[in-house]
Amino acid sequence: LPFTRLNGGPMDYTPGIFVQDLASVTDGKNTSWVNATIANQLALYVTLYSPLQMAADLPEHYEQFMDAFQFIKDVDIDWIQSKYLLAEPGEYVVIARQGKKDGQWFCGGVTDDHKRTVEVPLQFLDPEKTYEATIYRDAEDAHYKENPQAYVIEKKTVTFHDFLPVTM
């Protein structure tokens, strides 16, 4: 979608699922599974442009992961500009977007079902400034089926000259 439909404009998409086993919320009637990690669900808020955004999971699920839910509260929903930083259609995409609300940058990356690490160039940042990045990422043992709720939140000082290693 980032390479086709979203090139023409926004679309309706509702990310934010934190509890991936739907049987747990349907008394076993729906055995479907959301094939994503929490970090992947957060990245979709940036990579899939939808200016009418919502949180798609149950409130009690967000209460279990309030630190991750903070991203949903903070992320902008409309953008001044968007930059595709790294991409291979059908495999992965990393997009940076500058929010209309306060000019803050958000960067999101998603991959297919193959875990990968990429070096994200930060040349979209102002070369005269230093930034504190809050990074929401998959934990080392995260897996969309076996451990979808394993994530790490870390802070790092970055500049225009840096490359940020991101594992998806």
Specify the residue positions occupied by each region the protein language model found.
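A glycine-rich phosphate-binding loop feature that marks nucleotide/adenosyl-phosphate handling sites
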Residues: 60-70
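Alpha-helix capping/termination and helix-coil
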Residues: 51-55, 76-79, 100
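Edge strands and adjacent loops of beta-rich recognition modules
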Residues: 69-97
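Structured core elements
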Residues: 12, 43-48, 95, 106-109, ...
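Carbohydrate-binding surface patches
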Residues: 89-131
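A mature extracytoplasmic/lumenal domain signature
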Residues: 54, 59-61, 111, 137
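Glycan-recognition surfaces
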Residues: 1-59, 85-87
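C-terminal beta-sandwich/jelly-roll accessory domains of carbohydrate-active enzymes
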Residues: 113-168
